[in-house]
């Protein structure tokens, strides 16, 4: 029943049941040859479960960093797309507003409102793959009808 301490430094290993060495009491499990000096995991201020928590924390931080990076990239990409398309959208809005103003008070006004809704005006059919506007037949149709 001797402690495996060397030069006054305890490594927490003992070969028999609890033993008092000097003024220090050593506790350990009889089933383990490499036992802790702590009676339970709660006695260890560093927490024996730290190595199992570290990968989980690392995964959480990695995932959050990935999500933050994606969000930043999407925001900057969306802003660039907005800046490029703003002029086109503004021009279409002015054209639709002009048509609606010219048809105000006429029987054609209700038909113009139905046809010139935003989903029709900004439909993919009016744009190529690079989102450059082709001829906008709907706007041209209404402009020709009003001339």
UniProtKB/Swiss-Prot annotation:
**One Pfam family linked to the record:** Yae1_N
The subcellular localization recorded is: Cytoplasm; Nucleus
Polar residues: compositionally biased ranges: 28-37
Q: Which GO terms describe its cellular component?
A: cytoplasm; nucleus
Q: According to the UniProt record, where is the region Disordered? A: 28-53
* Keyword Coiled coil annotated: no
Please give a single GO biological process term from the UniProt record. protein maturation
Q: Which UniProt keywords apply?
A: Cytoplasm, Nucleus
User: Acidic residues compositional bias: what residue ranges?
Assistant: 40-51
- Region called deca-GX3 motif, residue ranges: 65-105
Q: Which family does it belong to?
A: Belongs to the YAE1 family.
Q: What does this protein do?
A: The complex LTO1:YAE1 may function as a target specific adapter that probably recruits apo-RPLI1 to the cytosolic iron-sulfur protein assembly (CIA) complex machinery. May be required for biogenesis of the large ribosomal subunit and initiation of translation.
Quaternary structure (record): May form a complex with LTO1.
Q: What is this protein called?
A: Protein YAE1
Q: Which organism is it from?
A: Meyerozyma guilliermondii (strain ATCC 6260 / CBS 566 / DSM 6381 / JCM 1539 / NBRC 10279 / NRRL Y-324) (Yeast)
